[in-house]
Design a protein with these regions (language model features):
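Conserved PLP-anchoring active-site segment centered on the Schiff-base-forming lysine
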Residues: 1-13, 20
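Short beta->alpha connector loops at strand-helix junctions that form conserved
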Residues: 3-4, 23-27, 102
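Short glycine-rich anion-binding loops that position phosphate/pyrophosphate groups of nucleotides
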Residues: 7, 48-52, 106, 189
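Short, structured coil segments at secondary-structure junctions
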Residues: 17-18, 94-95, 179
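Active-site phosphate-binding strand-loop segment of PLP-dependent enzymes
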Residues: 22, 27-82
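PLP-dependent aminotransferase class I/II
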Residues: 97-177, 181-184
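Conserved PLP-binding catalytic core of the aspartate aminotransferase-like
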Residues: 166, 178-207
Length: 209
């Protein structure tokens, strides 16, 4: 199970590996309907904050979904969590079925290094490593490893960068409001906005010109 409006590669990978899936509709505010994830399923994945909406779900909602799916794996994709609120990492020791995935591509601005990682209990990590080693034992090059290590060391630079991005996001919201836009309350580094008089294609073409 995963949301119908979400990261575009969930269904791509599911189709590639012939994994059947079911998309769950978001509510009218583009938020998860947690009860839709109570049904029997083979696994759950969802991003928090979501992309492309930017919506951040409170940790209580995340935990509720995990708690109702303890017989299957629940993956919380936290690519944008550094711009939002509390992480599901604090639930790792409480739920054996939880995997939290994060990346250096967003808040650390290192998309080109292709650094991503999963955090879970030792048993699930072992299973992930078994699967990884059967496909590609060396998923990161030396340059990425060195850059990743140095990025982790410089916590001050990272925190300052996140702070500036969040400040810019809030400034952008104010400016969009002045221009007549409405938008969702973003917990990411982007804003999902619309204008009552112009559709997305018109705006795109005008900006492109």
């Amino acid at each position: 199970l995963f949301p119908d409006v979400t990261y575009s590669f969930y269904d791509v990978w599911a189709d590639l590996y012939r994994i059947p899936y079911e998309c769950q509709k978001l509510d009218e505010d583009f938020k998860l309907v947690k009860e839709d994830y109570y049904k029997e399923n083979g696994g759950v994945i969802f991003p928090n904050p979501n992309a492309p909406t930017g919506i951040y779900e409170d940790l209580s909602v995340v935990e509720d979904i995990i708690a109702h799916n303890q017989d299957v794996i629940v993956i919380v994709d936290e690519a944008y969590i550094d711009f939002a609120g509390r992480s599901a990492l604090e639930l790792i020791d409480k739920y054996d079925n939880l995997i939290v995935v994060q990346t250096f591509s967003k808040a650390r601005s290192m998309a080109g290094m292709r650094i991503g990682y999963a955090i879970s209990n030792p048993t699930l990590i072992k299973y992930l490593n078994d699967a990884k080693y059967s496909f590609n034992s060396y998923t990161m090059n030396q340059t990425s490893i060195v850059c990743g290590v140095e990025a982790v060391k410089d916590r001050e630079y990272f925190e300052n960068g996140v702070r500036k991005i969040v400040e810019t996001r809030e400034w952008a919201k104010e400016e969009l409001t002045k221009l007549g836009f409405t938008y969702l309350d973003s917990g990411s580094n982007f804003i999902f906005a619309k204008h009552p008089e112009y559709d997305a294609k018109e705006l795109f073409e005008a900006l492109k010109a």
